[in-house]
From Swiss-Prot:
This is Actin-related protein 5. Residues 373-383, 417-428 have a biased composition (Basic and acidic residues). SMART domains: ACTIN. Residues 394-418 form a coiled coil. It is found in: Nucleus. Proposed core component of the chromatin remodeling Ino80 complex which is involved in transcriptional regulation, DNA replication and probably DNA repair.
Length: 651
């Protein structure tokens, strides 16, 4: 088969799907590889008066359309209902995959055509099972009628794109960091060493989920506000990989470093404005009245809508009753079945129930706001005397209030002074009371003087507190009542009045802030330490060392001279430097290695597939319909960027 002019290239990733033509510089379609089916919507329809007398149902079930990728307007609102064709990086749900293909071909201009006339380049998982490829080939050839397909691995396509822009090399160690898994892929002499590939079951999905759990545990009050979408944005824009994780942790333990590098994320909230906080009693009452009026309007409108719906339903049921009275029994039975009504008695019962409900609604008067009980309290509020302005009256009340506060403070200070041992007042009272006690003792002892040891025990001094505790209760209670009355009047007439008892609370904005600090390095660290999420697998550095040990020293050196990073997680800042440190530790002394990365980690696989689709020998990589019919659905043609074909053993 010769090289076709236009090839449809589909990078079918588990996180994002990219679709476009091979002769373009970027994909025409990019979307999240998920779909959802919204809840069914009951839409009301008009009830025409048909000529045959058969009524139309008041409400009909309108089937909900499946939304795919970019058609999902609010992905967080339907997060619980999102579906994916993937289980990790393997396609397992073929109904969902078919719906995604329908979306792709519709957006790419194939809507209404009987078959797809262009060949397709499609990415698949590394070591994709034959069963999955068999289902994919059957779907493409049988359902969509494509002429040919070429399967390839996204990481190898990305490597082809990198080589196309630079020099060609035949040996490399490709590290593919995907959404669900991470692979270490050795390539020798231009061929994939599939038997030595190793996989780490940690990817972008696990990083995002780990951050979600950490933030929800850290801020349980904002559980609903900490969503997956917000965590994805934090991971994509702010997380980075530490070159020395332990050293970075020690830095975050220092308060100065924490204050300098902490990132505060403001969650949405409804602030309390100063205008609302300084409203007078009349203004607050007016706002409550307006709110009550709005609620009553909503209630009356809903009752009106319910009344209209009942009248329409009653109209339909009366039409049904007329069919029975006109002896049109066949139409009557059909209409009953459409309305899901069992028999005539049930119909009469529904007519009676709806009629009574309509009658009650029409007889009931519209709700009106009740007179507020707060108005009586406002009317009883003291007012300025005749001949005195309100401003002068309030100033006089403020002056009297300050005098009461000063008197109260003086009494409090005196009470505290009397309770202390070393003040002059306490010593004077001690002398007087001690003298009285001795005098009383002498009278009882018939003139004999003796020291009773008063004051040697600290508990003896409590007598002053007991004596002076209630000596001014009557004056204090009267002052407190008068003070409360003054403050009540001042707060009612003066919006700027401050009674001095307001508690300084933390800003509402700060209560809705998330501190994103050590999570910056802690979350992506699970690539190197999967044990942080409870995984028993080795980290990325140990995995690379294990793969290299499967080859000879000369082969190891050839591969580490071209270490290539690809995949979405390869975008983390610091990954290249961290891997350089790990290679320096695991490689022999003074040995050389080089680490490269693509210019665009998310598009490099799609661009590499476009490069292959534009090659003169591209036709040799295509699995045609003839190959599909002759060799079976699991067969495919191998090439530099594809998996290796191992036929399924026959029983």
């Amino acid at each position: 088969m010769g090289s076709p002019k236009r090839v449809l290239v589909i990078d079918n990733g588990s996180y994002e799907c990219r679709v476009g033509w091979n002769n373009t510089k970027e994909p025409a379609l990019r979307f999240r590889n998920v779909l959802t089916k919204p809840r069914k919507d009951r839409k009301k329809e008009a009830i025409p008066d048909t000529t045959d007398g058969a009524p139309t149902p008041v409400a009909a079930e309108v089937p909900a359309e499946i939304q795919v990728g970019n058609d999902i307007t609010n992905i967080e609102a339907v997060r619980a209902h999102l579906k994916s064709p993937f289980e990790r990086n393997i396609i397992t749900n073929w109904n969902h995959q078919e719906q995604i293909f329908d979306y792709i071909f519709t957006k790419m201009g194939f809507e209404g055509e009987q078959s797809i006339a262009n060949p397709i380049v499609l990415t698949e998982a590394l070591a994709n099972p034959n069963f999955c490829r068999q289902n994919m080939s059957e779907l493409l050839f049988e359902c969509y009628g494509i002429p040919a397909v070429s399967y390839g691995i996204d990481a190898l396509y990305s490597w082809e794109h990198y080589q196309n822009r630079r020099k060609k090399v035949s040996d490399a160690l490709i590290i593919s960091l995907g959404y669900s898994t991470t692979h270490v892929i050795p390539v020798l002499n231009g061929k994939l060493q599939l038997q030595h590939v190793r996989r780490l079951n940690v990817g972008g999905y696990h990083i995002i989920t780990y951050l979600l759990c950490l933030m929800q545990m850290k801020y349980p009050v904002h559980l609903n506000a900490i969503s997956i979408s917000r965590m994805e944005k934090l991971v994509h824009e702010h997380c980075h990989i530490a070159v020395d994780y332990r050293e970075e942790l020690l830095k975050w333990g220092q308060m100065d470093y924490y204050e300098e590098h902490i990132m505060k994320i403001q969650l949405p909230y409804n602030p309390v404005t100063a205008t609302n906080a300084l409203l007078t009693a009349e203004q607050k009452l007016e706002k409550r009245r307006e709110l009550a009026m709005r609620l009553l309007e909503i209630k009356n409108r809903r009752e009106g809508e319910k009344l209209l719906e009942d009248e329409q339903q009653l109209f339909v049921y009366n039409k049904l009753r007329q069919l029975y009275e006109q002896d049109k029994l066949q139409k009557f039975e059909l209409a009953l079945a459409q309305q899901q009504i069992g028999n005539l008695d049930e119909l009469d019962s529904l007519i009676s129930t709806i009629s009574n409900r309509i009658k009650r609604i029409k007889e009931r008067p519209l709700s009106s706001p009740k007179p507020s009980k707060q108005q009586e309290k406002i009317d009883k509020m003291p007012k300025a005397p005749e001949g005195v302005s309100q401003a002068d009256w309030l100033a006089e009340l403020q002056s009297k209030r300050e005098q009461l506060l000063q008197r109260k403070q003086t009494r409090q200070q005196q009470r505290q002074e009397q309770g202390k041992r070393h003040t002059h007042a306490a010593q004077e009272r001690m002398r007087i009371i001690s003298t009285l006690a001795r005098s009383e003792k002498r009278r009882k002892a018939n003139g004999e003087e003796e020291d009773d040891g008063f004051g040697m025990n600290d508990n003896d001094w409590d007598v002053y507190k007991r004596i002076n505790r209630y000596n001014d209760d009557s004056d204090s209670d009267a002052d407190n009542e008068q003070l409360l009355e003054f403050e009540k009047i001042l707060s009612h007439y003066d919006v700027n009045f401050d009674d001095g008892n307001a508690v300084q609370t933390q800003s509402a904005a700060e209560n809705y802030q998330l501190h994103f600090g050590v999570e910056d390095i802690r979350v992506p660290e699970i690539l190197f330490q999967p044990s942080m999420i409870g995984s028993p697998e080795a980290g990325l550095a140990e995995l690379i060392a294990f793969v290299l040990k499967l080859f000879t020293a000369q082969e190891q050196q050839r591969m580490v001279e071209h270490v290539y990073l690809t995949g979405g997680c390869a975008q983390f800042r610091g990954l290249k430097e961290r891997l350089a440190r790990e290679f320096l530790e695991m490689r022999p002394f003074q040995s050389k290695f080089s680490i490269y990365e693509s210019d665009d980690h998310t598009l490099s696989a799609w661009l590499g597939a476009c490069v292959q689709a534009s090659q003169p020998n591209f036709g040799q990589t295509l699995t045609t319909r003839k190959d599909y019919q002759e060799h079976g659905s699991e067969y495919f043609r191998e090439h530099r960027a594809s998996n290796l074909f191992y036929p399924t053993p026959k029983d």
